[in-house]
Amino acid sequence: MRLSLIDLWLDRLPQNASTNEATCDRFPLANVMKPENKPDEGGRAPRIALLACSVLEREIALYRNGADHIIETRFFEMGLHDNPDHLRTTLQAALGELDVRNDIEAVALAYGLCGRGTAELRPLRHRLVIPRAHDCITIFLGSKERYAAHQKACPSCYYYTPGWNRECRVPGPEKIEASRKSLALKFDEEDVEYLLETEREQWAMHDTATYLDLGTSDAEPGAEYAKQCADWLGWKFERLKGDPSLLHDLLWGPWDAERFQIIEPGQRLVHSPDERIMRVATDAG
């Protein structure tokens, strides 16, 4: 997801300030047929702890069905990538807390590089695995190659997903109203309107709302919401079929080097400025 200027400003609010940011409660849960998830042929899924962004909460619930090997799951609020240092500190602290566990073989991160917020993470006792992804959009599309191809074909697209829709964190009328309420806690009316206008100018760089889903219960109302936002903005609308394979294999394996980066204790995750997106390094280099 692209960083929002408004969200960067809101990050400057005092930590104890209530933003009263509304959620878009038009995405009810519905019954969906859960997939028959299983590990790769001939293998068993490794016992893992899962650290995940809550933007993927319903997708993970769907594709972890039957996953007794996932011993512990922790979800963190979406939008932490607006402050990459805070995301890194939060995840590193969670890794430290998982050190005491003797019943896991690895920690899986349902994140991408996320504004380099996961760069410099260091596993302490258990190896760490993360998909080779710029952000959650790569996870929805199923591969870094598909992400790169779509970015090339539609550089002016803005991505909508069920999770981002639920939190009103995508361009649209409810995002404007939620931002106005939050900014009013910190700034006077003139400054609020200036910041909102700056946000609208950022949105003007885009002309297409691209909606992605992985078959969760809120997929259809989420698509309708994205279409309504596109109409309000005067944008085109497209819906792409998501590919759950990257998320499924993060949860179940296999973790091949082409799609996943494994970081062993004594290593750290760093950004790679090529198609790999990320690599490992030691403190020596």
Question: Where in this protein do the model-derived segments appear?
Answer:
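A conserved mid-domain beta-alpha-beta active-site/ligand-binding segment of alpha/beta enzyme cores
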Residues: 152-220
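A short beta-strand-loop structural module common to alpha/beta enzyme folds
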Residues: 70-84, 239-241
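Glycine-rich, highly charged phosphate/nucleotide-binding loops
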Residues: 84-98
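Extended, charge-rich low-complexity interaction segments
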Residues: 100-114, 119, 160-176, 262-285
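Extended, basic/helix-rich recognition subdomains
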Residues: 194-285
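Gly/Ser/Thr-rich loops at beta-strand to alpha-helix junctions
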Residues: 51-58, 80-81, 108-119, 134-135, ...
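Long, charge-dense
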Residues: 126-172
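N-terminal basic/disordered segments at the start of proteins
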Residues: 30-67
